[in-house]
């Protein structure tokens, strides 16, 4: 999951054709009327140009409309109009992802404003199990059949409350709630059944497998542990739960043909990248298809520009031409060694570390001639946990006198990846950079002996 780093979320719905951010479940199926057959391959091609590793297709949002011909409800593409009748987004999305060698998964909303079973009570006022048994769990099982190579199934936490829906009616709306989503949706059974079908899938929103970072604005905490909750996580939490940050590339989650969709610029998206991927989180960026079932040109242009920025600013690793040393290194054992040169060998399965009990160390990278540097990236060997608590980065023009870099960036955690802008800003690119004949990375505190598998310099 964490090795994916960046992915995309694609939302096309019946609400795309009503210009509403959320539907109500009262929309007629014929409202879903794409002007041509939606093209998931184009969605993923746009994402790939921005160096994204995969995507999650929203195949059922809160309005309950299913973007595949499900057997669980008539509120699906089978009863839509025009090109919509031929739509099977899970199939086309999975096929396209495999062709493009990308990861794929599906978002399915447990809340269903179209189902008469959702929130239904019996004559004694108790919630029935009909929705979970007849609709929700079978829908998830259907989606699992689209491929055992799915990497994530995403379950939104929004549920009931003050938002009114049809719940089986096209003409009148009502408000419904449920008391406990874990029991109502039969989550333990859901987790077990889906993992039996998809052993390698990560399930978001139904347990502790991966966590929401706590906002929808594309940033995580500068301190970010892969355990615990929210933006920062917790060093002391007992279960691994990598942070996932969902964000929008436009004003809303869905395309609105009547509004300025306020497409975010590549520079804004690059800042998001630094504040998520560069802070030990994964970035899930929403790309809403338009009424033609395509990612709009205005979005595609900025995504391609983001890819260009990533190539230009983080594409040439200067560390590969450096000499790297450490003042403290664990002795080789068996066929393995833990030498500092492992940090620049390009192999994510080798790493540098210190002897047991050594929680501090100094690593230096040196060049024969000064280099122009702007970013330093560190990556822990997280197969053995996340350990580093505090570090600092310094540069030297002459290899003798060093100056601390990174501004007010909190150089605390590293995790899978930490990118430090040496000028201290994620928003402002350092045009001039800093001349450096040497870079010093001092690990000042670690939970146990620190382990790093890669250092990159850009």
List each language-model region with its residue ranges:
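Carbohydrate-binding surfaces of carbohydrate-active enzymes
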Residues: 46, 80-81, 87, 93-106, ...
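Aromatic, loop-rich ligand-recognition surfaces of beta-strand-rich domains
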Residues: 298, 310-313, 345-409, 423-458
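An active-site-proximal structural segment forming one wall of the substrate-binding cleft
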Residues: 46-48, 82-100, 127-150
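Catalytic domains of carbohydrate-active enzymes, especially glycoside hydrolases
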Residues: 38-62
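The substrate-binding groove and active-site-proximal loops of carbohydrate-active enzymes
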Residues: 23-40, 69-88, 121-134, 154-164, ...
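Aromatic-lined carbohydrate-binding surfaces of glycoside hydrolases
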Residues: 59-73, 85, 106-120
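Single conserved hydrophobic/aromatic residue that forms the stacking wall/gate
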Residues: 1-7, 12
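Substrate-binding cleft/loops of secretory-pathway carbohydrate-active enzymes
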Residues: 114-127, 146-149, 154, 158-249, ...
């Amino acid at each position: 999951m964490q090795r994916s780093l960046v992915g995309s979320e694609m939302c096309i719905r019946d609400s795309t054709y009503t210009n509403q951010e959320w539907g109500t479940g009262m929309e007629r199926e014929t409202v879903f009327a794409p002007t041509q057959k939606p093209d998931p391959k184009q969605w993923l091609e746009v994402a790939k140009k921005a160096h994204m590793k995969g995507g999650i297709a929203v195949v059922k949002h809160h309005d309950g409309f299913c973007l595949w011909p499900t057997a669980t409800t008539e509120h699906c593409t089978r009863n839509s109009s025009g090109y919509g009748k031929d739509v099977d987004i899970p199939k086309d999305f999975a096929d396209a992802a495999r062709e493009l060698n990308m990861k794929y998964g599906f978002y399915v909303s447990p809340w269903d404003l179209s189902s008469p079973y959702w929130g239904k009570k019996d004559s004694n006022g108790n919630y029935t199990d009909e929705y979970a048994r007849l609709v929700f769990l079978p829908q998830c099982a259907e989606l699992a059949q689209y491929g055992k190579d799915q990497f994530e199934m995403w379950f939104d936490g929004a549920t009931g409350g003050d938002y009114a829906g049809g719940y089986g009616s096209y003409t009148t709306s009502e408000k419904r709630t449920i008391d406990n989503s874990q029991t109502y949706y039969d989550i333990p059974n859901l987790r077990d059944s889906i993992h039996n079908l998809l052993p390698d899938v990560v399930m978001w929103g139904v347990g502790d497998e991966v966590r929401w970072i706590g906002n929808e604005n594309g940033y995580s905490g500068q301190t970010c542990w892969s355990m615990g909750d929210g933006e920062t996580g917790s060093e002391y939490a007992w279960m691994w739960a990598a942070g996932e940050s969902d964000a929008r590339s436009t004003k809303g989650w869905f395309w609105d043909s009547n509004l300025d969709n306020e497409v975010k610029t590549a520079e804004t998206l690059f800042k998001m990248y630094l504040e998520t991927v560069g802070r030990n989180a994964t970035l899930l960026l929403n790309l809403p298809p338009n009424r033609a079932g395509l990612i709009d040109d205005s979005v595609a242009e900025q995504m391609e520009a983001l890819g260009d920025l990533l190539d230009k600013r983080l594409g040439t690793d200067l560390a590969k031409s450096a000499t790297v040393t450490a003042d403290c290194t664990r002795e080789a054992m068996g066929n393995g060694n833990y030498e500092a040169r492992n940090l620049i060998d390009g192999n994510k399965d080798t790493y540098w570390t210190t002897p047991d009990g050594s929680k501090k160390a100094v690593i230096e990278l040196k060049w024969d001639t000064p280099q122009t540097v702007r970013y330093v990236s560190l990556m822990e060997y997280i197969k053995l946990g996340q350990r580093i608590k505090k570090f600092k980065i310094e540069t030297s023009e002459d290899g003798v006198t060093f100056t601390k870099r990174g501004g007010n960036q909190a150089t605390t955690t590293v995790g899978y990846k930490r990118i430090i802008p040496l000028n201290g800003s994620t928003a402002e690119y350092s045009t001039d950079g800093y001349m450096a004949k040497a870079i010093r990375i001092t690990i000042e505190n670690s939970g146990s002996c620190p382990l790093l598998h890669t250092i990159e310099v850009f």
